[in-house]
Every structure is written in C-alpha cells, then in structure tokens.
Amino acid sequence: MRVWAISNQKGGVGKTTTTVALGSLLAASGKRTLLIDMDPHASLSGYIGVEGGAHGSVYDLFGIGGNPLPPGTLVHATKWDHLSVLPASAAMITLDRQLGTRPGMGLILSQALAELAVDFDHVLLDCPP
C-alpha cells in the first residue's frame, strides 16, 4: 500500500482538490483507493458526500472519551467504484489539546494504516494547513 500525504502550510492552495483528483484517477484505473480527511473543516468529506458525525470519523481512531474504534469500521464506501473515504470531524480541531502527552499518540495513524493495508492499494491523506 502506498500512502500519499497532500499537505501545505497554507490553506486554500488546492490540497483537497488535488487529493480528490489523484484519488479519482487511481480509483478509475482500478486501484483500491482510500481518501482520509485529516482536516477539521471536512471539505473532502463534504465534497465526496460522506459526513463523519454518527457514522464515525478519523477522530474516533484516537479514543477520546472511550475506546478507539477499529479503522475498518470508520471507512465509508462512495458512489464511485474502488473509492472509499474515512471522513473528518470538526471535533478534530481539539485533538492536539485532548491527546496532550499521551504515550504512543504519534503511532495511532500509522497503526490504523497498517490495519487497512490489506484493503487498499493507495491511501491519500488530505492534511490540514
């Protein structure tokens, strides 16, 4: 599985557009593609038409206020073949403060990606500014 992080320090430069375009091209070529919306603004989630909320989001990987949810249960199919999304949540804006100095917090996303590796050929991370 290849992991692509689409990032830039500035907002409004096309990170989400680039993520959707690359993901769509990969999916159209038959590659099992997962888009992960890491931005609390959740633009990618809205654009694809999959909102986090009650259905779970990236935020739920971190187990704030309870146990973390398995990443596979948070992945949503889209109306496009071979394209899935793990949506964002506005609650992610508080994640740094809530995690504090919790041991292993830097490994949570890495571990989630390892669990998803058998299901996807490519993962694209739409990062916040």
Language-model regions: role of each:
Residues M1-P129:
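P-loop NTP-binding core
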